[in-house]
Amino acid sequence: MKAQKGFTLIELMIVVAIIGILAAIAIPQYQNYVARSEGASALATINPLKTTVEESLSRGIAGSKILIGTTASTADTTYVGIDEKANKLGTVAVTIKDTGDGTVKFTFATGQSSPKNAGKEITLNRTAEGVWTCTSTQEEMFIPKGCNKP
């Protein structure tokens, strides 16, 4: 009698079924992980801008003269040091009023970020008194630490 070599069709089908079950669990978890990491990346992109805004306001530069871009700052205008598209996941916008209140906002781009984040925003809000808060329109499970649902 010959010794058996290889696997039977049933054994191979069982292995394929097990791999399919594992993939059905792992893929959604990975997509959630990606969405959470994108939120952290967006917040890390805009968080340093708080320092630039505060420094500009303390030098007496009015909020409307705090602009997005990497151009060299002048005596009466501050460029925040990053481009609007500094992070490939979306765009950055800075809107500070002359009174000192305003926002630094990151908007996730459709097609560049995960579908779970597309079109969502992370916003750093500044009050005229200089208090910063963070809000996000992302689903609760994807909001980075330190931010809240509006």
UniProtKB/Swiss-Prot annotation:
Task: Provide the Gene Ontology terms for cellular component.
Answer: membrane; type IV pilus
Protein location: Fimbrium; Membrane
Q: Which cysteines are joined by disulfide bonds?
A: C134-C147
Propeptide, residue positions? 1-6
On this chain, the residues bearing N-methylphenylalanine are F7
Any stretches that span the bilayer, and where are they? 7-27
The record gives the membrane topology as: Single-pass membrane protein
What keywords is this UniProt entry annotated with?
Disulfide bond, Fimbrium, Membrane, Methylation, Transmembrane, Transmembrane helix
Question: Which PROSITE patterns does the entry mention?
Answer: PROKAR_NTER_METHYL
Biological process (GO), any one? cell adhesion
UniProt lists the family membership as follows: Belongs to the N-Me-Phe pilin family.
Q: What is its quaternary makeup? A: The pili are polar flexible filaments of about 5.4 nanometers diameter and 2.5 micrometers average length; they consist of only a single polypeptide chain arranged in a helical configuration of five subunits per turn in the assembled pilus.
Q: Write the protein's name.
A: Fimbrial protein
